[in-house]
Amino acid sequence: MFQVAGLIVFCGLLAQTTALLEALPLGKALPLALDQSPTDLVGSLTSTLSNGLLSEGVLGILGNLPLLDILKAGGNTPSGLLGGLLGKLSSTIPLLNDIVDLQITDPQLLELGLVQSPDGHRLYVTIPLSLVLNVKTSVVGSLLKLAVKLNITVELLAVKDEQGKSHLVLGDCTHSPGSLKISLLDGLGPLVPQDLLDSITGVLDNVLPGLVQGEVCPLVNEVLSHLDVTLVHSIVDALIQGQEFVIKV
């Protein structure tokens, strides 16, 4: 008797649940569980961009920048910027005649930053990069070891095409003015005067930002083209509506 009553109650509850589910529009049964908060969107975007850049080989590209070739090919003298620098200073520091290489080591992609434009319709992603630059000589090996940090700033725009498909596209992509930081990690003590360090960093100031920008920005564009469709749709909708992203500082 008790088993029959229990079965009747269970069947009644099942019928009510079925009726409620049928009343919901198809594809909208669990809208809250699928939606991401603005904070989640920011975390998902920066994490995806970071992983994408690593997958595209950004560290290998940084480690193989043709810096020495570009320095030798530039400038107003036949021997290029580096040759001009060495010629100017070799009379006081003979070791400079023996410089044979500029080697890049320890390239790193640091934690990405993100800010939203005041109108709420654009995002700016900061891509902090770092590396160590070794100026080598044939006589003593490493003459200078410089720590280099540089930020690339990427503008992300939300667009929808004629078919209504959402796209997150690359706007401006440039090195952040004043973000290049060069510091001396190691050197041969008194053999490395300040004017030498200033001269080398001055050359790097003119060459390195544009070189890194030219390599990294195409990678960002490639990563954007492979973003998860659901993530792109959510971000584009939020930007078009001017929804404020919650960004943790």
UniProtKB/Swiss-Prot annotation:
Expressed in lung and trachea. Pfam families: LBP_BPI_CETP (PF01273). This is BPI fold-containing family A member 1. Glycans are attached at residue 151. Keywords: Antibiotic, Antimicrobial, Disulfide bond, Glycoprotein, Immunity, Innate immunity, Lipid-binding, Secreted, Signal. It comes from Sus scrofa. GO terms for biological process: antibacterial humoral response; antimicrobial humoral immune response mediated by antimicrobial peptide; immune response in nasopharyngeal-associated lymphoid tissue; innate immune response; multicellular organismal-level water homeostasis; negative regulation of single-species biofilm formation in or on host organism; regulation of sodium ion transmembrane transport; surfactant homeostasis. InterPro entries: Bactericidal_perm-incr_a/b_dom, BPI_fold-superfamily_member, Lipid-bd_serum_glycop_N. Belongs to the BPI/LBP/Plunc superfamily. Plunc family. Residues 81-86 are annotated as: Important for surfactant activity and antibacterial properties. It is found in: Secreted. GO terms for cellular component: extracellular space. Lipid-binding protein which shows high specificity for the surfactant phospholipid dipalmitoylphosphatidylcholine (DPPC). Plays a role in the innate immune responses of the upper airways. Reduces the surface tension in secretions from airway epithelia and inhibits the formation of biofilm by pathogenic Gram-negative bacteria, such as P.aeruginosa and K.pneumoniae. Negatively regulates proteolytic cleavage of SCNN1G, an event that is required for activation of the epithelial sodium channel (ENaC), and thereby contributes to airway surface liquid homeostasis and proper clearance of mucus. Monomer. Interacts (via N-terminus) with SCNN1B, a subunit of the heterotrimeric epithelial sodium channel (ENaC); this inhibits proteolytic activation of ENaC. Disulfide bonds join 173-217.
